């Protein structure tokens, strides 16, 4: 055996994990889908599990609505995965009981213990951190979110460091399959929390968020948890051109595997016909999505989904346009 092989075994034994290995397996990144077919097409299936995703954009762009849509689909996905696993174990136990051999009798207690642990743990949960204090539970329910099964964190006088530590500890339990932080700019670091309004602070949320990203990424991978951070946009006053920036610093941007910009697009009436920007009572609007950064799929062109204020996400016209896009790509 080579010296490197012995050293690899020694280090893996020392750290009690197979963190060093020769060769790599192709790891399929699981996704939590949007309800929008165009959004799923752009992101190759939705929000990646085990990664950090950022939704950012101006007010009314559809960031929170899209995040809640992901929450609803995540709950369905987690329930289905739980039911499938339980049914699989029950089926295995049943087959072994029918065999009635010594080897089967040895395996049954282990499988029963495994089944008991899974049933006690239950399906994975959605964690929603409402730092803005603006979550409308009725709107969330209209989007399909089961708010009774969702863990809601509403910080009162906690600093950014304390809120981020709460998130870290909850995800490390392994029971959380999706975490939504709404939103990053509302986190107040300890340094700013203790100072008066007149005193100017530098750095802001960047430093605690950078440390948080370094700590949370391994937990997201091990516990198979997706993380969505909702962010706002700011005008960059230091530039002579009309440019925008987002709070959180460069460390946050580097940690994100997927960054999606949301824009409020054309206003619509009840028949999904376009209205002027000055219309007083629109029934909904198109939501523009742009993939700004991705490590999990190819960057595609911008897409638009349909949102009605009474029927939430209106899919009928979107399916039609999605078919047209696929037909166009097939021709060319």
What are these regions (language model features)?
Residues 1-21, 85-88, 94, 99-101, ...:
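C-terminal regions of RecA-like/P-loop NTPase motor modules
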């Amino acid at each position: 055996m080579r010296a490197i092989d012995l050293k690899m075994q020694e280090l893996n034994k020392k750290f009690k994990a197979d963190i060093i290995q020769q060769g790599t397996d192709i790891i399929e990144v699981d996704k939590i889908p949007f309800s929008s077919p165009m959004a799923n097409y752009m992101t190759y299936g939705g929000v990646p599990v085990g990664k950090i995703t950022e939704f950012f954009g101006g007010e009314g762009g559809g960031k929170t609505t899209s995040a809640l849509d992901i929450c609803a689909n995540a709950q369905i996905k987690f329930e289905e995965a739980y039911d499938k696993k339980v049914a699989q174990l029950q089926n295995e136990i049943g087959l072994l009981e029918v065999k009635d051999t010594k080897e089967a009798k040895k395996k049954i207690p282990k499988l029963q213990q495994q089944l008991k642990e899974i049933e006690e743990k239950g399906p994975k949960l959605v964690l929603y951190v409402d730092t803005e204090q603006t979550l409308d539970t009725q709107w969330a329910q209209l989007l399909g979110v089961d708010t009774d099964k969702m863990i809601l964190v509403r910080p009162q006088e906690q600093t950014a460091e304390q809120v981020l530590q709460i998130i870290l500890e909850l995800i490390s339990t392994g029971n959380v399959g999706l975490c939504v932080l709404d939103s990053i700019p509302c986190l107040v670091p300890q340094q700013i929390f203790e100072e008066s309004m007149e005193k100017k602070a530098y750095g802001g949320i960047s430093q605690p968020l950078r440390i948080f990203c370094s700590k949370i990424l391994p937990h997201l991978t091990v516990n198979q948890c997706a993380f969505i951070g909702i962010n706002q946009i700011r005008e960059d006053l230091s530039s002579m051109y009309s440019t925008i920036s987002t709070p959180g610093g460069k460390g946050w941007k580097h940690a994100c595997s997927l960054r999606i910009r949301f824009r409020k697009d054309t206003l619509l009436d009840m028949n999904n016909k376009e209205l002027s920007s000055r219309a007083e009572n629109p029934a909904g609007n198109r939501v523009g999505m742009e993939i700004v950064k991705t490590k999990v799929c190819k960057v595609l062109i911008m897409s638009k989904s349909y949102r009605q204020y009474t029927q939430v996400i209106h899919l009928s016209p979107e399916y039609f346009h999605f078919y047209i896009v696929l037909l166009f790509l097939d021709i060319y």
